[in-house]
């Protein structure tokens, strides 16, 4: 039984808003805040993962593709949900990424079983459209948050075992419906883990949750939560993706993960020149090097969020011509991201954020405008994805 819906203004998009404001002001795009059971596997990859995504010449790896909806589908009408999922199909996606926030399904207490009715709708609708679901599990309800931390969903759980039990209950429910892919937390290397990132604590949560999910689903594929890629700035707790991987690895957290998720937003139409993309394998201290040092040189990296914004729509003075130019740049970035990530070591999947602008949250990365008009980026993604599959 679910008594109430928590205040969504403080949900995952809260961190997207904070970082969006910072980066859009600098003229960049947001860098804040899922696999087929047979995607790229590597050293230390647990049971259930096999190797299938392989280099294919000049076009690079044949990637998995997805569209990220955060929690918008969870609360959408049936007609809105169907329109949104049709965009994923048009784009050529195999997956959608959706939040499974614990606080939405068991908000009252542990004495009431989770009510998964809302998520049932999403999973069933995705299946009807031929799409798989990557679920991001996070956001403990108030009663389950760490002592002394109860005013933000970013609070870690008071009990890793309780969080893992909730995850296992969800996995047992959805495995028969074809949902096997899980991302544990969203951006634990920034303020989305309150009050500051804690690699050791996150490693313990990842281990407990992955073991619990695998106990009920032998086909499960569990990812280390999508790591934020933005640069540190004053007043914001932040650990780089590579350093966070290294620290989680030292704490033993990678042993039960099948992949690492990452959220690079290039901020320019040439994705290959972006520092957030270079951080995967091109910078001195990069993610692939960190994985290799930790003993997992071939662990897949899933880009479970990336995209490009159209910031002009937030400025009342921006002309239609200027917005059209920004939309063309967004489309160019979409093409460049597919081509660049397909050539980037370890990368196995790319998810675009997001389907439609959310003006009230200042999130303007949609394949559609807030009013529903389709942007050129949707066609650009569809063309680039089709080319990647040849």
Give the ranges of each region predicted by the language model.
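Terminal targeting segments of Actinobacterial cell-envelope proteins
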Residues: 1-12
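Aromatic-rich peripheral "rim/lid" segments of glycoside hydrolase catalytic domains that contact
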Residues: 2-4, 55, 188, 313-390
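Secretory targeting and sorting signals
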Residues: 10-34
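Boundary/entry segment of secreted carbohydrate-active catalytic domains
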Residues: 44, 48-95, 99-101
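Short acidic/polar active-site loop segments enriched in Thr and Asp
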Residues: 65, 94, 177-180, 258, ...
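A general structural detector for well-ordered alpha-helical segments in enzyme core domains, enriched
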Residues: 83-88, 115-125, 166-170, 201-209, ...
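Substrate-binding cleft and catalytic face of glycoside hydrolase catalytic domains
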Residues: 91-236, 267, 297, 308, ...
């Amino acid at each position: 039984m679910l008594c109430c819906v928590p205040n969504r203004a403080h949900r995952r998009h809260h961190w997207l808003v904070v970082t969006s404001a910072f980066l859009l002001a600098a003229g960049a795009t947001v860098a804040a805040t899922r696999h087929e059971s047979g995607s790229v596997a590597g050293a230390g990859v647990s049971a259930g993962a096999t190797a299938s995504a392989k280099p294919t010449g000049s076009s690079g790896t044949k990637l998995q593709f997805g569209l990220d909806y955060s929690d918008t589908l969870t609360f959408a009408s049936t007609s809105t949900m169907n329109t949104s999922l049709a965009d994923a199909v048009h784009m050529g996606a195999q997956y959608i990424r959706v939040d499974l926030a614990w606080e939405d399904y068991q908000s009252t207490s542990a004495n009431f079983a989770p009510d998964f009715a809302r998520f049932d709708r999403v999973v069933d609708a995705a299946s009807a459209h031929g799409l798989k679901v990557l679920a991001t599990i996070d956001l403990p309800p108030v009663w389950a948050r760490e002592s002394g931390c109860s005013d933000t969903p970013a609070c870690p759980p008071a009990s890793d075992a309780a969080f893992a039990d909730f995850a296992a209950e969800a996995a047992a429910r959805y495995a028969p419906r074809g949902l096997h892919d899980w991302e544990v937390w969203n951006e634990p290397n920034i303020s989305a883990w309150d009050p500051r990132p804690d690699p050791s604590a996150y490693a313990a949560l990842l281990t407990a949750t992955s073991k619990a999910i695998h106990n009920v689903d032998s086909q499960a594929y569990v990812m280390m939560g999508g790591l934020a890629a933005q640069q540190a700035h004053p007043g914001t707790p932040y650990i780089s993706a590579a350093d966070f991987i290294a620290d989680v690895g030292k704490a033993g957290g990678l042993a039960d993960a099948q992949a690492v998720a990452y959220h690079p937003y290039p901020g320019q139409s040439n994705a290959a020149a972006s520092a957030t993309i270079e951080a995967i394998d091109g910078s001195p201290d990069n993610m692939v090097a960190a994985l290799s040092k930790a003993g997992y040189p071939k662990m897949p990296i899933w880009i479970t969020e990336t995209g490009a914004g159209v910031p002009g729509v937030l400025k009342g003075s921006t002309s239609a011509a200027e917005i059209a130019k920004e939309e063309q740049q967004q489309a160019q970035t979409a093409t460049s991201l597919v081509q660049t990530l397909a050539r980037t070591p370890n990368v196995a999947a790319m998810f675009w954020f997001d389907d439609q602008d959310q003006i009230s949250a200042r999130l303007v990365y949609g394949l559609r405008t807030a009013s529903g008009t389709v942007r050129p980026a949707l066609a650009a993604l569809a063309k680039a994805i089709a080319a990647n599959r040849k």
